[in-house]
């Protein structure tokens, strides 16, 4: 890990400890990761640290005629985050009903990349919950993701350069059907 990321991690650790003195609930249920840190954090949906857009494909069921009211758009089916943040981020978190949020938002801090499922290091929930709990939720997310149409699932995954992935994400080693990794034969669907 780079020295820059170590400083950044320590900075966020101190910031999150002050802002969140008590542990909050985080759980995965029916395709949505419910994260009680989000409403008071808004780090991931606020203005980003660069102008390069972070693409978030929308499922066909989430697309409607006035998407530009909810999101900055890269394409008719792709919302994005950049240095402007998100149009739907309000003072208490997301203003959209859960079913209208991009899958990327519904999974965060789990991140669907073209190589599998990862965990974003800077999220306060990642700092405060044990990794084994994240692995359980990640397996539940994979089990939900594979119920989507294969073409939708593949389009939802994004590509991030490997150096950035190593710096900002935890590799959960959970491949998906389209990822170049071989599925782990020991992986069993999480029984709910």
Regions from the PLM with identified roles:
Residues 1-192:
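Short loop/turn segments that flank or connect secondary-structure elements
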């Amino acid at each position: 890990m780079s020295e820059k990321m170590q400083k950044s991690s320590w900075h966020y650790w101190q910031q999150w400890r002050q802002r969140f003195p008590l542990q909050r609930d985080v759980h995965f249920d029916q395709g949505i990761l419910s994260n009680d840190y989000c409403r008071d954090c808004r780090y991931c949906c606020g203005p980003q640290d660069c102008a390069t857009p972070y693409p978030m494909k929308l499922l066909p069921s989430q697309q409607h005629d006035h998407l530009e009211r909810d999101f900055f758009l890269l394409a008719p089916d792709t919302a994005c985050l950049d240095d402007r943040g998100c149009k739907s981020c309000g003072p208490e978190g997301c203003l959209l009903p859960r079913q209208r949020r991009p899958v990327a938002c519904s999974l965060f801090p789990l991140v669907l990349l073209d190589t599998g499922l990862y965990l974003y290091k800077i999220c306060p929930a990642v700092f405060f919950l044990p990794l084994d709990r994240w692995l359980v939720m990640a397996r539940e997310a994979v089990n939900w993701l594979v119920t989507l149409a294969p073409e939708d699932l593949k389009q939802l995954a994004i590509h991030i350069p490997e150096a950035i992935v190593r710096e900002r994400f935890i590799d959960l080693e959970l491949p998906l059907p389209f990822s170049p990794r071989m599925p782990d034969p020991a992986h069993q669907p999480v029984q709910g």
